[in-house]
């Protein structure tokens, strides 16, 4: 008998409950003696009935086969640990014509799916696959209904607060809102706002019609390259860079002057030049005045 089996038998006795070893040994020996007379002439060690130690105590020793030679070679000093196994070894070998069967083999026959009611591998795999498919279908059906409501919960608190604030400042337009709507039919539009190009275009020639915004492309022809550097690619590249920067600055200055002419600016004092930051402030004030005028016009349309 292996030493591991002795340790497991010590666990059987449950020494943590303050039961001394001699009392537990007597209890175990008397139990084996009582059961021996009832099962000695029966073929109890078979696939339908487990060994006495497994049947009565509900434990499975970790041994493959118990042979008489193992019990005979046990030293005398280890008798306290292996004394209960002598009776068990005699019980296992009571039938000389029956081959010895180990605990592992008997356990395998005992725990077979047909005898213990356990599911086979194919049955357990089929049930697992069915449950996985059922869960995946439920998740797909629930995600479709939760997408429209869960976007606010996914956002962090800061983003959610910002989203709520934007909705309050710029509410969505609904078909039943009180906001006045522009007529969609061209017959309802007044004739003074109808032209050949389409509705909402005043007829007067004095209305503002800005040209499309475009950034001019700067090109320097090769004919403008000086003759003394045209053979040196490095100098040609530097010269083109300088010329392009000059043209870009001139174009920026002209565009700024056109912008300043289109806004109201304070008069010059003593012929001095007005600083650019003051001119840009005038541009911002005009933009704000345009926005205020649009809001006032919107209120007039809402009240009408």
UniProtKB/Swiss-Prot annotation:
The keyword Nucleus applies. The keyword Lipid biosynthesis applies. PROSITE patterns: BHLH. Pfam families: bHLH_INO2. Keywords: Activator, DNA-binding, Lipid biosynthesis, Lipid metabolism, Nucleus, Phospholipid biosynthesis, Phospholipid metabolism, Transcription, Transcription regulation. It is found in: Nucleus. GO terms for cellular component: nucleus; RNA polymerase II transcription regulator complex. GO terms for biological process: phospholipid biosynthetic process; positive regulation of transcription by RNA polymerase II. It comes from the Eukaryota. Residues 236-290 form the bHLH domain. GO terms for molecular function: DNA binding; protein dimerization activity. Present with 784 molecules/cell in log phase SD medium. Positive regulatory factor required for depression of the coregulated phospholipid biosynthetic enzymes. Also involved in the expression of ITR1. Efficient DNA binding requires dimerization with another bHLH protein. This is Protein INO2. It comes from Saccharomyces cerevisiae (strain ATCC 204508 / S288c).
């Amino acid at each position: 008998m292996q030493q591991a089996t002795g340790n497991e038998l010590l666990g059987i006795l449950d020494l943590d409950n303050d039961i001394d070893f001699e009392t537990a040994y007597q209890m175990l020996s008397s139990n084996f003696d009582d059961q021996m007379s009832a099962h000695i002439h029966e073929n109890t060690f078979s696939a339908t009935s487990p060994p006495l130690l497994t049947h009565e105590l509900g434990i499975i020793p970790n041994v493959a086969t118990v042979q008489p030679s193992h019990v005979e070679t046990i030293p005398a000093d280890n008798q306290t640990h292996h004394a209960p196994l002598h009776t068990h070894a005699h019980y296992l070998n009571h039938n000389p014509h029956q081959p010895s069967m180990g605990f592992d083999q008997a356990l395998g026959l005992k725990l077979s799916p047909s005898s213990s009611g356990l599911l086979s591998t194919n049955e357990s795999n089929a049930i697992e696959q069915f449950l996985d498919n059922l869960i995946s279908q439920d998740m797909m059906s629930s995600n479709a209904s939760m997408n429209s409501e869960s976007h606010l919960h996914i956002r962090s608190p800061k983003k959610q607060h910002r989203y709520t604030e934007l909705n309050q400042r710029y509410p969505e337009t609904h078909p039943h809102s009180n906001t006045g709507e522009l007529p969609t039919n061209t017959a309802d539009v007044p004739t003074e706002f109808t032209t050949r190009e389409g509705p909402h275009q005043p007829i007067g020639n004095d209305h503002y019609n800005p040209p499309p915004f475009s950034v001019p492309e700067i090109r320097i022809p090769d004919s403008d390259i000086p003759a003394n550097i045209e053979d040196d690619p490095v100098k040609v590249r530097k010269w083109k860079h300088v010329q392009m920067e000059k043209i870009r600055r001139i174009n920026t200055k002209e565009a700024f002057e056109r912008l300043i002419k289109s806004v109201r600016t304070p008069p010059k004092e003593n012929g001095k030049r007005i600083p650019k930051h003051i001119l840009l402030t005038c541009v911002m004030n005009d933009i704000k005045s345009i926005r205020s005028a649009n809001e006032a016009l919107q209120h007039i349309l809402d009240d009408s």
